Regions:
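A small/polar active-site loop signature that marks catalytic segments
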Residues: 2-168, 172-173
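Active-site Gly/Thr loop motif
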Residues: 131-134, 180-194
Length: 194
């Protein structure tokens, strides 16, 4: 068995353990420590590899003491995401936490409140309230569900699942996105294998 270890704030991954001579190839997914900093470094590297001059290091804007003034700015690149149903399949089948965090921020941006977690939480609260789910039934600390401060009641979960199932626009894409134990990747890939 192998174990993967990375110190917080480090990009160095330590792999330890043993692998049998006849072991099959396998892949392990590892979360990045800071998705926005990782993206900034990856973007800088790709730009340089493509011959685009980049001065200075990649910087996570959230780590700056003084925030840059960004208005007005002209976008230099626009990327249109795949349909939500496709992204949801990746999020749920592979347990892609980066997607989950991004979904929460995107919800806030689409609602016109800004693309951040707080605006996403406000919009989620508004929708849940319209579905009859009061704020006392949950705490949404982050998009991925990894925070120990997230919680929800069984009533809330059942209400959401029933609502999705009864909505013909969302039922089939949602069911298609659900992970299947022992078949799909992510956190349940090795379950239900006998």
């Amino acid at each position: 068995a192998l174990s993967l270890r990375r110190l917080p704030g480090s990009e160095r991954l330590t792999v330890s353990g043993s692998i049998g001579q006849l072991a099959k190839e396998s892949a392990r997914l590892v979360a990045v420590d800071s998705p926005s900093a990782y993206f900034a470094r990856a973007l800088r590297r790709v730009l340089v590899e493509r011959g685009i001059e980049v001065t200075g290091p990649a910087v996570d804007v959230r780590a700056l003491d003084v925030k840059p003034v960004l208005d007005p700015v002209e976008p230099f690149f626009v990327h249109h995401s795949p349909p939500l149903s496709d992204a949801a399949r990746v999020l749920m089948k592979v347990s892609q936490n980066l997607y989950a965090e991004t979904f929460l921020k995107t919800i806030g941006a689409v609602a016109g409140e800004g693309g951040n977690a707080e605006s996403g939480r406000k919009e989620v609260a508004r929708v849940l309230q319209s579905w009859g789910i009061p704020p006392e039934e949950y705490v949404l600390a982050d998009g991925s569900g990894l925070s120990r401060y997230n919680y929800l009641t069984p009533h809330m979960l059942v209400t959401i699942l029933e609502r999705i199932y009864r909505d013909p626009r969302h039922r089939d894409p949602f069911i298609a996105a659900l992970p299947v134990g022992g078949e799909d990747g992510g956190t349940i890939a090795r379950r239900f294998k006998g």
